[in-house]
Amino acid sequence: MSLINTKIKPFKNQAFKNGEFIEITEKDTEGRWSVFFFYPADFTFVCPTELGDVADHYEELQKLGVDVYAVSTDTHFTHKAWHSSSETIAKIKYAMIGDPTGALTRNFDNMREDEGLADRATFVVDPQGIIQAIEVTAEGIGRDASDLLRKIKAAQYVASHPGEVCPAKWKEGEATLAPSLDLVGKI
């Protein structure tokens, strides 16, 4: 079943953010764009490169009104230990949610049950809590925060411009499309 255009389910998890442990629920996402950035595990190999890339783009994400939630099935304590020991992870200013029971990961239908780990997946959620974009890659394939930014800008544009769609590789300021009978077969 596709989760596109479905509402995120209620959740309550502990997280590590800016040197503190905090509780995060679905209510924290209301009224704001959110990215749930699932990754398999702390202290691994591809994961820190991705999380560091998102950290490098975090200021721009914040300017777009986007909150980022990194999620793995590690505990919030493990997130703190990783944050304290890795120069790359120490750059992170967004919330790192611990999901040791896997409940949040299962809410997004993103659990590798045989391993108890999250798949490498990104979910873009609109201010109403509706999933607008999903990207899932194999464990050995890292994601690109630049493309995540592009997708968020496209999702925000489409949300504020009903009747328009963003074509492949669309970037902010470029032409969009207005689907109509006249356009059929002309692209």
From Swiss-Prot:
Residues 2-157 form the Thioredoxin domain. Disruption phenotype: Increased sensitivity to hydroxyurea, probably because more reactive oxygen species accumulate. Keywords: Acetylation, Antioxidant, Cytoplasm, Disulfide bond, Oxidoreductase, Peroxidase, Redox-active center. One of its GO terms (molecular function) is hydroperoxide reductase activity. GO terms for cellular component: alkyl hydroperoxide reductase complex; cytoplasm; cytosol; membrane. Gene3D superfamilies: Glutaredoxin. It catalyses: a hydroperoxide + NADH + H(+) = an alcohol + NAD(+) + H2O. It is found in: Cytoplasm. It comes from the Bacteria. The keyword Cytoplasm applies. Its EC number is 1.11.1.26. PROSITE patterns: THIOREDOXIN_2. The active site is at C47. Induction: Repressed by sulfate or cysteine. The modification N6-acetyllysine is found at K17, K93, K153, K169, K171. Pfam families: 1-cysPrx_C, AhpC-TSA. The keyword Oxidoreductase applies. GO terms for biological process: cell redox homeostasis; cellular response to sulfate starvation; hydrogen peroxide catabolic process; response to alkyl hydroperoxide; response to hydroperoxide; response to oxidative stress; siderophore biosynthetic process. Homodimer; disulfide-linked, upon oxidation. 5 homodimers assemble to form a ring-like decamer. Belongs to the peroxiredoxin family. AhpC/Prx1 subfamily. The active site is a conserved redox-active cysteine residue, the peroxidatic cysteine (C(P)), which makes the nucleophilic attack on the peroxide substrate. The peroxide oxidizes the C(P)-SH to cysteine sulfenic acid (C(P)-SOH), which then reacts with another cysteine residue, the resolving cysteine (C(R)), to form a disulfide bridge. The disulfide is subsequently reduced by an appropriate electron donor to complete the catalytic cycle. In this typical 2-Cys peroxiredoxin, C(R) is provided by the other dimeric subunit to form an intersubunit disulfide. Thiol-specific peroxidase that catalyzes the reduction of hydrogen peroxide and organic hydroperoxides to water and alcohols, respectively. Plays a role in cell protection against oxidative stress by detoxifying peroxides. Is the primary scavenger for endogenously generated hydrogen peroxides. This is Alkyl hydroperoxide reductase C. It comes from Escherichia coli (strain K12). The gene is ahpC.
